Curated annotation (Swiss-Prot):
Keywords for the protein's UniProt record, in alphabetical order: Carbohydrate metabolism, Glycoprotein, Glycosidase, Hydrolase, Polysaccharide degradation, Secreted, Signal
Protein name: Extracellular endo-inulinase inuB
Gene responsible for this protein: inuB
Active-site residues (renumbered): E43
Reaction(s) this enzyme catalyzes, per UniProt: Endohydrolysis of (2->1)-beta-D-fructosidic linkages in inulin
Residues glycosylated per entry: N109, N372, N419, N424
Family annotation (PANTHER family): EXOINULINASE INUD (AFU_ORTHOLOGUE AFUA_5G00480) (PTHR42800:SF1)
Role noted for this protein: Endo-inulinase involved in utilization of the plant storage polymer inulin, consisting of fructooligosaccharides with a degree of polymerization (DP) value from 2 to 60.
Signal peptide residues on this chain, from the entry's feature table: 1-25
Gene source species: Aspergillus niger
Family note: Belongs to the glycosyl hydrolase 32 family.
UniProt EC number: 3.2.1.7
Gene3D superfamilies: Exo-inulinase, domain 1, Glycosyl hydrolase domain, family 43
Length: 516
């Protein structure tokens, strides 16, 4: 769970309803991004696939449109796009709120909470006692394939006093358990974040219930990590193939509260080795470790228990860094569109690369395509297209000194502009005139990411547009910028232009996206 003082949260409800398929124009509701029908959600929790069903849990206030009364909301999907709301999975009760955590399958029933014929699914979460403001680690389990969850009677499984020797606040700042089974050592591993202490701690267990501290990963032990990156929260950890090498590496993903490229919180990932007790980080490169250069991609986690036949590492985050400030009245926040995370060499550097899940193609329809066409200064293409839910793909060869601009959600006085500036190889999102930016000092501005042409001089940009968001993927997905926007309904135009030189458009595909 993110620190209540860190304003980067969103919302969702826990009712068994169907996700609205069209934006509610009076409240900026997105068309194809996950949101609840009312109230508050922060980051996703316990992402897991059970059979053919994807489970999404999330931090949720079921009674108000602000942070508080935090439980685990729950929704399910068979395609990661059409979601059905389910009842609250882990409730806020007896003065203990259910903060962030993760889920995992216990196939050998090492926890003893199921049986050999029906092994349990387990969920670990931070218990936050409101009266004392203390945090401890707790366990819940499901023996009906994730439909309902029961809190372990022996909670907490790691008490504040057990955390205290490893936490300078005496255990008050230990949270967000990431738990997985480490087949190499035969132990269960828990990774805990220690907020303002800028460290993670690693614990082991043979039975998922009794835990022993093993080591800490501190900022000072990571070569190249800036001391300005503070407030570590929401850890994830997994092995990831390095494409083209036949090798894998361990990855730790987390959300610092400060120090991101766009200012404030953001998600970074580092590679390293893990021996079952200690994670040793590789030296980091500040230009490649951030997964998103926008303002609105926070608290990312990945789905687990995904079959090897699928093979994808799919992540999602909450899109909101402004607490309760965004100008929505019945909800706060939304889930980023699910994206794959890979690790590969791009040019001379190893990069984390991300792309929207391919399932998006099944709910989109091409509106206009262009191919092998030169665009020159003074021309405007795509101006006949209107839409607030789009998937726009542009691949082009820019002239030296040129700037290619894709303008989305364009109106009489509003627009969000995605630029590629050839001279400094920079991808940017300009929210200066994107609509309502009065709600927060950080709501406007320009966010940038480095994006080099490929070996042939080609630049590729993909933009997911929804009612109140843009997610921009550059190149193979090595440059990503995700931002909230709040334009008027009538600002639904599109434009493709170039200045400072020509650009040869290899391909353009504008697709309309609909869950119907």
């Amino acid at each position: 769970m993110l620190n209540p003082k860190v304003a980067y949260m969103v919302w969702m409800t826990c009712l068994g309803l169907t996700l609205p398929s069209q934006a509610q124009s009076n409240d900026y509701r997105p068309s194809y991004h996950f949101t609840p029908d009312q109230y508050w959600m922060n980051e996703p929790n316990g992402l897991i696939k059970i059979g053919s069903t994807w489970h999404l849990f999330f931090q949720h206030n079921p009674t108000a449109n602000v942070w508080g009364n935090i439980c685990w909301g729950h929704a399910t999907s068979t395609d990661l796009m059409h979601w059905a709301y389910k009842p609250t999975a882990i409730a806020d009760e007896n003065g203990v709120e259910a903060f962030t955590g993760t889920a995992y399958y216990d196939p050998n029933n090492t926890s003893g909470l199921g049986d050999s014929a029906n092994p349990p699914y387990l969920a670990w979460f931070t218990g936050y006692t409101t009266s004392s403001q203390t945090q401890d680690q707790r366990l819940a389990f499901s023996v009906d394939n994730g439909a309902t969850w029961t809190k372990f009677q022996g909670n907490p499984i790691i008490s504040t006093s057990q955390e205290a020797p490893h936490d300078i606040t005496g255990g008050l700042e230990s949270r967000d358990p990431k738990v997985f089974f480490h087949r190499q050592s035969g132990n269960w591993i828990m990774v805990l974040a220690h907020g303002g202490q800028d460290k993670l701690s690693f614990w082991t267990s043979a039975d998922t219930i009794h835990w022993t501290w093993q080591s800490d990963l501190k900022s000072t032990s990571i070569n190249g990590l800036s001391s300005d990156i503070t407030g570590w929260e929401v850890p994830d950890m997994f092995e990831l193939p390095v494409e083209g090498t036949g090798e894998t590496t361990w990855v730790v993903m987390m959300t610092p509260a400060e120090g991101s490229p766009a200012g404030g919180n953001g998600v970074l990932a580092i590679t390293g080795s893990f021996d079952g007790k200690t994670f040793t980080a590789d030296p980091v490169d500040a230009s490649t470790m951030w997964l998103d250069n926008g303002r609105d991609f926070d608290g990312a986690l990945s789905w687990v228990n995904v079959p090897a036949s699928d093979g994808r590492r799919i992540i999602a985050a909450v899109m909101n860094s402004y607490g309760s400030n965004p100008p929505t009245t019945t909800w706060k926040g939304m889930l980023s569109f699910p994206r794959t995370l890979s690790l590969k060499k791009v040019g001379t550097q190893q990069h984390f690369v991300q792309q929207p899940i391919t399932e998006l193609d099944t709910i989109s329809t091409s509106m206009q395509t262009l191919a092998n066409q030169t665009i020159t200064p003074g021309q405007t293409l795509l101006s006949s297209i209107r839409g607030t839910a789009l998937d726009v793909r542009v691949a082009f060869y820019p002239d030296a000194g040129s700037v290619l601009s894709l303008t989305v959600r364009k109106g009489a006085s509003e627009q969000t502009v995605i630029n590629y500036t050839q001279s400094n190889a920079t991808l940017s999102v300009d929210r200066t005139e994107s609509g309502d930016i009065s709600y927060d000092p950080a709501a406007g501005g320009v966010h940038t990411a480095k994006l080099e042409e490929d070996g042939t001089g080609l630049v590729s940009i993909r933009v997911l547009v929804d009612t109140c968001s843009v997610e921009v993927f550059g190149g193979q997905g090595e440059a990503v910028i995700s931002d909230l926007i709040f334009p008027s309904d009538s600002s639904d135009g599109l434009a493709l232009e170039v200045t400072g030189g020509n650009a040869v458009l290899q391909s353009v595909d504008v697709r309309s996206v609909s869950l119907e």
